[in-house]
Amino acid sequence: MNDASATSESSALLEPEDMARLRATLRRVIEVGADIEPGLAGAVRQVLDAPGSLWRAQLAWAIGTATGLSRETASRLAAAVESFHNASLLFDDLPAMDDAETRRGRQAVHRVHGEAAAILAGLAFVHRGYGLVLEGLEDLPTADRRAVRRQLEADLGLAGILDGQARDLSPGVADDPASLAAGKTVPLLRLALLLPALVAGAPADLRARLLGLAEAWGLAYQILDDLGDLVARTDGVGTDAECGRLNLAGRVGASAAVARLDLELARAAVAAAEIVRQHPGLEGPLLRLQRRFVAQRHRFALAEAA
C-alpha cells in the first residue's frame, strides 16, 4: 500500500499552529535510548524521521479537539493512531507481504536494517500505540473504557486490519472486490475517526456519521491506490500486479472502479457535511481532505484521457 497515493506529505489539514503541535508530539512518540540495539534503534528512527502525510493523525486530532478533548489528550490519541499506522506499513513492506523497495522516498526499513529489526520496530510502534491510548483512558468511566477496547479490537484485531491483510495476500479467495479493498484501509481510518470520539464521549449519532465517513473515505483511498497500479507507479512500493494479486481495479476494470470511487466520494461528501453541521470546527480538516481525494480522482481521469 502506498501511503502517499492520495495525499502529499505537504498536505496539512490543520492550521499551522496545530500542525506544529502535532508534529512535535509525533517526533517524540518513542524515546530511542542510547543503549538500544543499533539495528532496532535505526529502524525506529528511520520511521520517525520520515513521517509521511499524517492525515489519519490529523483527523484524529481534529475530531478529538472538536468533541471536547484537551489538546494534550487529542495529541496522544493522534500519536497512537499514527503509531499503529507506522507498524502496519513496516509489516506491509516485508518480503512476505508486499516486498517493497522504498517507503516515503527512502529505502524500506527492512532493506536498510534487516527484516528482524523491521518486525521488532513494528512491534515497538504497536506497543507504544496501546500505551498512548491507555494514557488517554485514565479518567474515563468503565463503560467508555470498554467501548474503546472494543473499537481497538475491531480495528486492530483478528477481524480487523489483520484479516484484511490476510485476504489481500490470498490470491483466488472468493471475496467481494470492494470488501477486500475496504478491509485493507478502513480499519485504521475508522480507528482514527472513532477513537477520539469515544474517548470524548461523543453522542451515538455523531459516531454513526463518523463511521459512515470512515467507510466511504477508506474505500475511496484504496480505489485510488489500486488505480495507481494501473498507470504503472514507479515509487518502488510493490504493486499488486507485481505481487501476483488482483486488486479491485484489476478485478472489475478501471471504468467500474472509477464509478465506485465516485459513489464513495459522494457518500463521503454527504457524511462530512452532516458532521460539519453538528461540529462546525471540523469544516476545515474534513473538507480539505475531501477536496484532495476529489482532485486525485480528476488527475487520474486526465492521465487516462491523455
What are these regions (language model features)?
Residues M1-E31:
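N-terminal amphipathic/basic leader segments beginning at the initiator methionine
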Residues M1, R291-A305:
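Terminal targeting/low-complexity segments that flank the catalytic cores of oxidoreductases
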Residues I30-V270, H279-V294:
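Mg2+-dependent prenyl diphosphate-binding active-site environment of isoprenoid biosynthetic enzymes
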